[in-house]
Amino acid sequence: MRLILSLPVLAVVLAMVLEGPAPAQAAPDMSSTLESIPGKLKEFGSTVKEKFRTAIDQIQKSDFPEKTRNWFSDVFQKVKEKFETTFS
């Protein structure tokens, strides 16, 4: 029973594949592609700009930079004290 049902489906799929793309699905010509490139690049640039700005704002609003700065200051102070006690 499955073989009887799958053969017509296979034939229809094979016919669709061999038919090729429909006219609406055909590739656009080169001139329209070249004309659309600047618009797409501008859209891409603005999208990247917004994502970058959002990321920078999140970093500035977080306390990560302050914690990192404090950690480095503490570590530097400990190393400095260790050098002073070792070499004095």
Swiss-Prot record:
Any Gene Ontology biological process: negative regulation of very-low-density lipoprotein particle clearance
Position of the signal peptide: 1-26
CC annotations in GO: high-density lipoprotein particle; very-low-density lipoprotein particle
Localization in the cell: Secreted
GO molecular function: fatty acid binding; phospholipase inhibitor activity
Source organism superkingdom: Eukaryota
InterPro entries noted in UniProt: ApoC-1_sf, ApoC-I
Main location class: secreted
Keywords of the record: Lipid transport, Secreted, Signal, Transport, VLDL
Role: Inhibitor of lipoprotein binding to the low density lipoprotein (LDL) receptor, LDL receptor-related protein, and very low density lipoprotein (VLDL) receptor. Associates with high density lipoproteins (HDL) and the triacylglycerol-rich lipoproteins in the plasma and makes up about 10% of the protein of the VLDL and 2% of that of HDL. Appears to interfere directly with fatty acid uptake and is also the major plasma inhibitor of cholesteryl ester transfer protein (CETP). Binds free fatty acids and reduces their intracellular esterification.
Membership in a protein family: Belongs to the apolipoprotein C1 family.
Protein name: Apolipoprotein C-I
Source organism of the structure: Cynopterus brachyotis
